[in-house]
Curated annotation (Swiss-Prot):
Annotated organism of origin: Psychrobacter arcticus (strain DSM 17307 / VKM B-2377 / 273-4)
Compartments where found: Cytoplasm
Designated name of the protein: NAD kinase
Enzyme nomenclature, EC number: 2.7.1.23
Cofactor: a divalent metal cation
Gene name in the database record: nadK
């Protein structure tokens, strides 16, 4: 990172790329609230307009008394009136914010206070420098598609939701497998006995689907991944289909448990035998903003520890042993 005097980080920027900056976060830990306060002060010191949603502004221990230019609005409005939205937390915080922001195509910058941080890729101690780079126009945009899910009974839509990562069919609290059938674009694919099915976007391929044995899919690909959860047949494997595909799932009449459906880990909804679950690409996309130098493969290496090896032992005979002989 180039060396800048601390005071230079907070100077106002002439003709910044973004002027109305939203700030969102969920206070799972004190560090999240602390970072939100620090970023709010940075934005204020740069003479930019800070916009916060009501939930974030009312977080416990968050003190905004020294912030001169702050507007507090409903969360549903923040994407409409902001040029850029900063989300503080982990990837879950960005998943939570995606529903409110995607339809406005407003760029989202994630500051990581979680664990992996595939979506929130800015470290808290780099926030001032990275934000300054972004405001000077040095950034790259990354458009991620979402999924829409509908539970239908006949022509009636019983429940609908959207997901950035995945839609998951699961057995809820039951220990029984689910018996279900799946079609893709009207074609029969299989009847399966398993603990469920993960339907993931490329973004979600590094989340729950990865732990289920699914492939990592580059976020630029137009594809959907179907990952069976503990299938009862060894031949059941993940399937990657076109991003334009429509997946239809029905519960077989021999099923013995109550299947549930969840989008991005939100509260689950039951799927009954007379209903159908439809999953396809959502018309909106979430626009992620990355500071200069973002590299998906580097993120994989770092966050999945691809380059971490056990201590390597030389195959050569130890010189000390040779000397002793």
């Amino acid at each position: 990172m180039p060396h800048l005097h601390e005071s230079e980080l907070f100077h106002a920027i002439k003709n910044p790329a973004f002027r109305r900056i939203g700030l969102m976060g969920r206070a799972r830990t004190r560090s999240v609230t602390q970072s939100i306060g620090q970023i709010a002060q940075i934005i204020n010191d740069m003479n930019l307009t800070l916009i916060m949603d009501v939930q974030t502004a009312n977080l416990p221990t968050l003190n905004l008394t020294e912030i001169e230019r702050v507007k507090i609005v409903k969360r549903s409005l923040i994407g409409e009136i902001c040029d850029l939205v900063i989300v503080v937390g982990g990837d879950g915080s960005i998943l939570h914010a995606a529903e409110a922001l995607a339809r406005y195509r407003v760029p989202v910058l994630g500051v990581n206070r979680g664990r992996l941080g595939f979506l929130a890729d800015v470290k808290p101690d780099e926030a001032a420098f990275k934000l300054r780079q972004v405001l000077m126009g040095n950034y790259q945009l990354d458009h991620r598609f979402l999924l829409t899910m509908e539970i239908r009974e006949g022509r009636k839509i019983i429940h609908e939701d959207m997901a950035l990562n995945d839609v998951v069919l699961h057995a809820g609290k039951s220990v029984h497998m689910i018996d279900f059938q799946m079609k893709i674009d009207g074609h029969d694919v299989y009847r399966q006995h398993s603990d469920g099915l993960i339907v993931a976007t490329p973004t979600g391929s590094t989340a729950y689907a990865l732990s289920g044995g699914g492939p990592i899919i580059h976020p630029s690909m137009d594809a959907i991944c179907l990952v069976p959860m503990h299938p009862h047949t060894l031949s059941s494997r993940p399937i990657v289909v076109s991003g334009t595909s429509e997946i239809c799932i029905r519960i077989h009449e021999d099923n013995r448990t109550q299947p549930m459906v969840s989008a991005d880990g939100k509260p689950s909804t039951p799927l009954d035998q007379e209903q159908r679950l439809y999953i396809r690409k959502h018309p909106d996309k979430l626009t992620l903003l990355h500071p200069p130098g973002f590299d998906f493969y580097e993120a994989c290496r770092t966050k999945l520890h691809w380059n971490v090896h056990a201590e390597e032992f030389s195959l050569d005979v130890d010189d000390d042993i040779m000397d002793d002989e």
